Design a protein with these regions (language model features):
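Anion-recognition interface
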Residues: 1-152
Length: 152
């Protein structure tokens, strides 16, 4: 029997919750998404102006603008052009296209067909949101930015 949304959800919940049902802050999946904790470590080594924080929704809406901003931030010559991005209606997002043979057009699937999106109960989602909320607010303070997902 292959992976199903339900089996993936069960495996995810077993990984991120303790036996008592609380969020396991030490679990690698949970810890990886604690952006504030990781960013605070980086800020001990680098100044805030050495970071470019990019919102996923901006990449989705205006990929060329975001890439141009990254090129300027890195002080590298502009390589990308607006015509290198095409909106794919079936995927509902922009994809990279190239006329060069060695670079294949790229628009990966969000979830590959072989990996079903996990089915997670509202109770677990609520626990995770409650756990991350203070960390997400701290990340907003550290970055000086607002994120759509920080107050869910």
């Amino acid at each position: 029997m292959g992976c199903t949304s339900k089996s993936e959800g069960v495996a995810f919940v077993q990984a991120v919750l303790t036996k008592t049902g609380s969020v396991d802050a030490k679990n690698v999946i949970v810890d990886t998404s604690n952006y504030a904790r990781h960013f605070e470590k980086w800020l001990k080594v680098f100044s805030r102006d050495q970071f470019l924080i990019v919102k996923e929704e901006e990449i989705s809406r205006t990929p060329f603008k975001v890439i141009r901003e990254a090129e300027e931030f890195l002080d590298v010559p502009g390589f990308f052009r607006e015509d290198m991005f095409v909106f794919e209606n079936d995927k509902k997002r922009y994809c990279f296209k190239s006329t060069r043979r060695e670079i294949n057009s790229s628009c990966p699937l969000m979830y590959p067909p072989s990996v079903p999106k996990p089915e997670i109960s509202e109770e677990v989602v609520h626990k995770l949101r409650d756990f991350y909320r203070p960390h997400n607010r701290r990340f907003e303070e550290l970055t000086g930015m607002n994120f759509s997902w920080s107050n869910l």
